[in-house]
């Protein structure tokens, strides 16, 4: 009986610590989701503003090229649809999100379109990406249980953005900016989706459907 009474304070302290860790984890998830939502909105606005500077025929042509082309970050293996996203573990979604954010650290500094607002946005984006990367890394550490086992493909090196965009052709400057902004918007949407699903799973909500 005495041993039971001795164990009770230990169990209570353990329970409080566990609850505190869960609350801190949710707080970090809330911050991360809010940050990536803001980045996604900024990406959408920058893309729309840039499209507004193009002639209708030019816009249609670039859109056709982009649909047939690919983003540099497509080298990162990620879920191909909603069903696969929901089947993925929280840890896998966090690692993919981390890689996607990391892949934009350099190209975010090259969004120097001839528009002062966009240049200011590109500086803000670089800072926000860095903060989000740190936050996701903390979430990975907080969610990790034992040794993570992922395919080697999940950690393959990305080709450098500079080399990729050097091969865009004669009108590469306009096309390069279009593809950078379109790919950035697409990737921020991906990260927003993955972090939202991961946050929902960690909150133990009954329904985490997209």
Swiss-Prot record:
Keyword set, alphabetical order: Disulfide bond, Hormone, Metal-binding, Secreted, Signal, Zinc
UniProt subcellular location: Secreted
Binding residue positions for Zn(2+): 38, 192
Signal sequence region: 1-22
Primary location recorded for the protein, binned into one broad class: secreted
GO function terms (MF aspect): growth hormone activity; growth hormone receptor binding; metal ion binding
GO cellular component terms given for this protein: extracellular space
One GO term (biological process): sodium ion homeostasis
Chain's role: Growth hormone plays an important role in growth control and is involved in the regulation of several anabolic processes. Implicated as an osmoregulatory substance important for seawater adaptation.
Protein name per the record: Somatotropin
Species for this entry: Coregonus lavaretus (Common whitefish)
Gene label: gh
């Amino acid at each position: 009986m005495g041993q039971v009474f001795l164990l009770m304070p230990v169990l209570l302290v353990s329970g409080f610590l566990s609850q505190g860790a869960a609350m801190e984890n949710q707080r970090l998830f809330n911050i991360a989701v809010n940050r990536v939502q803001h980045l996604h909105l900024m990406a959408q606005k920058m893309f729309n503003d840039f499209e507004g500077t193009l002639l209708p025929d030019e816009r249609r042509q670039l859109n056709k090229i982009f649909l047939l082309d690919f983003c540099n970050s497509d080298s990162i293996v990620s879920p191909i649809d909603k069903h696969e996203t929901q089947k993925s573990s929280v840890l896998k979604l966090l690692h993919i999100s981390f890689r996607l954010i990391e892949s934009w650290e350099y190209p975010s500094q090259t969004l120097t379109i001839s528009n002062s607002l966009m240049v200011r946005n590109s500086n803000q984006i670089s800072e926000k990406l860095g903060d989000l990367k740190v936050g996701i890394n903390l979430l990975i550490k907080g969610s990790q249980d034992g040794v993570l086992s992922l395919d080697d493909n999940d950690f393959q090196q990305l080709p450098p953005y500079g080399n990729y965009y050097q091969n865009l052709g004669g009108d590469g400057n306009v096309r390069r900016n279009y593809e950078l902004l379109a790919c950035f918007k697409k990737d921020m949407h991906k990260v927003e989706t993955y972090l939202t699903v991961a946050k929902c799973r960690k909150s133990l909500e009954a329904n985490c459907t997209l």
